[in-house]
């Protein structure tokens, strides 16, 4: 269970770094807004899911 928690936490940290760089770039680029908007919403949904998963796994690990 601990390894699963660590993997989920690592995925959350990596996705957070990607979103910190990717979202401002997507907002600043004038072309292909529809594709960028879908990627931002997909990344945001995945980020929220990972936060919930890490929270639940933290309950079981600690």
UniProtKB/Swiss-Prot annotation:
Parts of the chain on the Cytoplasmic side: 26-36
Lumenal side: 1-4, 59-62
Record bears the keyword Membrane: yes
Keywords: Formylation, Membrane, Photosynthesis, Photosystem II, Reaction center, Thylakoid, Transmembrane, Transmembrane helix
Subunit structure: PSII is composed of 1 copy each of membrane proteins PsbA, PsbB, PsbC, PsbD, PsbE, PsbF, PsbH, PsbI, PsbJ, PsbK, PsbL, PsbM, PsbT, PsbX, PsbY, PsbZ, Psb30/Ycf12, peripheral proteins PsbO, CyanoQ (PsbQ), PsbU, PsbV and a large number of cofactors. It forms dimeric complexes. Part of a photosystem II (PSII) assembly intermediate complex PSII-I; crystallized from a strain deleted of psbJ, it forms monomeric PSII before addition of the oxygen evolving complex. PSII-I includes 3 assembly factors not found in mature PSII (Psb27, Psb28 and Psb34).
Similarity remark: Belongs to the PsbZ family.
Described purpose of this protein according to its UniProt entry: May control the interaction of photosystem II (PSII) cores with the light-harvesting antenna, regulates electron flow through the 2 photosystem reaction centers. PSII is a light-driven water plastoquinone oxidoreductase, using light energy to abstract electrons from H(2)O, generating a proton gradient subsequently used for ATP formation.
Protein name: Photosystem II reaction center protein Z
Annotated gene: psbZ
């Amino acid at each position: 269970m601990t390894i699963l928690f660590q993997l989920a936490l690592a995925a959350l940290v990596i996705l957070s770094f990607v979103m910190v760089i990717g979202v401002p770039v997507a907002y600043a680029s004038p072309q292909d807004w529809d594709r960028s908007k879908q990627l931002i919403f997909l990344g945001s949904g995945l980020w929220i899911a990972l936060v919930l998963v890490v929270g639940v796994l933290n309950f079981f690990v600690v």
